[in-house]
Design a protein with these regions (language model features):
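Gram-negative (and chloroplast) outer-membrane scaffold detector with strong preference
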Residues: 32-46, 51, 55-144, 182
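Intrinsically disordered, low-complexity segments enriched in small/polar residues
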Residues: 18, 23, 31-34, 39, ...
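Short edge beta-strand segments in beta-sheet-rich domains
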Residues: 2, 91, 172-176
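Compositionally biased alpha-helical segments
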Residues: 1-37, 41-47, 51
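Short, flexible, glycine/charge-rich loop motifs used to bind or transfer phosphoryl groups or to couple energy/partner
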Residues: 27, 60, 168
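A short local loop/turn or secondary-structure capping micro-motif enriched for an aromatic residue
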Residues: 9-10, 80-81, 153-154
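Predominantly the C-terminal beta-signal and adjacent terminal strand-loop region
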Residues: 106, 125-185
Length: 185
């Protein structure tokens, strides 16, 4: 037991959840430790490839190094929806993310960079998706993310047009504007 004159200040500490993260409130920023993401989205083709949109699903698992910086590894599946391009790929990537505020609503920057493996001969090549967005904390452990970015997807494409002057394989950027919605945990 302490004597009252020895006590300078009485404070209440935040309780710990099972993962070792402190709960700072009902819906606050992320804490240091394991963190995972699952995103669904669509990329709208641009330029020469404006009709080559694709459905996407990605997930990333890693470590929140400090409250504002995350690093992880991820995998996804992309499927092109154009009638002339029936193929998909599986990107494997490193994921780097910065959350700017320690609050329940925070802007973020995200960079996914890696290589996509084609589900057939088309669709394999360098993959990069920088994006900006907003995270809405739902609880101390979960958040909803909305992001907008530009996706670079280098692909080896086979040209077989009878009316064109080129036949064979060519590497093209099937890049586009990506819109993603997902959750983190």
């Amino acid at each position: 037991a302490y004597k009252m004159e020895d006590v300078e200040k009485i404070t209440k500490e935040a309780p710990f959840v099972s993962s070792g993260r402190k709960i700072k409130g009902k819906a606050k920023a992320t804490c240091i430790g394991y963190r995972g993401f699952v995103d669904d989205g669509y990329t709208f083709g641009v330029g020469k490839w404006k009709n080559t949109g694709r459905l996407e699903m990605t997930m990333s698992h890693g470590y929140q190094v400090v409250p504002w910086f995350y690093v992880g590894l991820g995998v996804g599946i992309h499927y092109w929806t154009d009638e002339d391009m029936d193929f998909g790929n599986i990107p494997l990537f490193a994921d780097f993310r910065a959350d700017f505020l320690e609050s329940s609503v925070t802007p973020f920057l995200d960079l996914k960079i890696g290589y996509a493996f084609g589900l057939n001969d088309n669709g394999k090549g360098f993959y990069c998706n920088p994006s900006v967005g907003v995270r809405f904390a739902v609880s101390s452990s979960y958040g909803i993310n909305v992001g907008l970015g530009y996706e670079v997807q280098m692909c080896k494409i086979y040209y077989s047009s009878y009316f064109g002057d080129y036949y064979g394989w060519k590497v093209e950027n099937l890049g586009g504007i990506s819109l993603k919605v997902g959750m983190d945990f």
